[in-house]
Each structure stands twice: as C-alpha cells, then as structure tokens.
C-alpha cells in the first residue's frame, strides 16, 4: 500500500430496490475495478445490497452515480450513503458473502 491515502475517501452504501438476482454485485465489482476503486459489495438478507468503497472523491462519485442505475436488470429505488476517511485496508474490490 505504498500510496498516500490523503484525498482518498470511503463511502458506505446501501442500495435498495430490485438489486438481488440481477447481477448487481458482479456488475458493481466490474465497474469499481474499471474505475480503480477498492472495497467490497454484498447482498443483505433484507433484499438490499451494501458496499464499502474507497478511492478518489471524483471517482467515488462516478461509482455512486452508477449505483443509482445499476445493471440493466436492476431497479434501484434508493441509495443511502455515509462518507468517512479512507483506511486503505483494501487492495482490490471483491464480492463478499451475504451478511
């Protein structure tokens, strides 16, 4: 992790709607990796998807904008977001097991 974390941010997201069974997690992984973001995404038992994402603020905004749409089969009804300082604990973006 030799790069400086200054300027990097963390966003914790909860994505609601028709977001499970529509390849949302894998599509999010592909999009986050394309953008150079790190973190994880997983399904929640209540039908939502949650993600923790770290990266440069402008790139995070691009990913969050994508989350409001999701893949073609998804129907996103809302995205809740909490911002914080990045920890640098992630080296890539992964799909995690359901919480």
From Swiss-Prot:
Which reaction is recorded as catalysed by this protein?
an acyl phosphate + H2O = a carboxylate + phosphate + H(+)
Keyword Ubl conjugation: yes or no?
no
Give the start-end ranges of region Disordered.
75-99
Domain Acylphosphatase-like, residue spans: 10-97
The record's annotation in PROSITE patterns points to: ACYLPHOSPHATASE_1, ACYLPHOSPHATASE_2, ACYLPHOSPHATASE_3
GO function term, MF aspect, one:
acylphosphatase activity
Q: Where is the composition biased (Polar residues)?
A: 89-99
> Which residues participate directly in catalysis?
25, 43
What transmembrane ranges does the database entry give?
none
Enzyme class of the recorded protein, top EC level: hydrolase
Assigned keywords, A-Z:
Hydrolase
- EC number(s) per entry: 3.6.1.7
The source's domain of life comes to: Bacteria
Q: What InterPro entries does the database record attribute to this sequence?
A: Acylphosphatase, Acylphosphatase-like_dom, Acylphosphatase-like_dom_sf, Acylphosphatase_CS
Indicate whether Hydrolase appears among the record's keywords: yes
Family, according to the entry, reads as follows: Belongs to the acylphosphatase family.
- Indicate what this protein is called per its UniProt record: Acylphosphatase
**Origin organism of this chain?**
Myxococcus xanthus (strain DK1622)
């Amino acid at each position: 992790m030799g790069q400086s974390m200054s300027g990097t941010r963390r966003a914790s997201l909860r994505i609601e709607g028709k977001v499970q069974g529509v390849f949302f997690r894998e599509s999010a992984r592909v999009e986050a990796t394309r953008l150079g973001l790190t973190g994880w995404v997983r399904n929640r038992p209540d039908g939502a998807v949650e993600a923790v994402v770290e990266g440069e603020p402008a790139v995070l905004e691009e990913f969050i904008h994508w989350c409001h749409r999701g893949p073609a089969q998804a129907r996103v009804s809302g995205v809740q977001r909490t911002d914080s300082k990045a920890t640098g604990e992630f080296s890539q973006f992964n799909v995690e097991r359901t919480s």
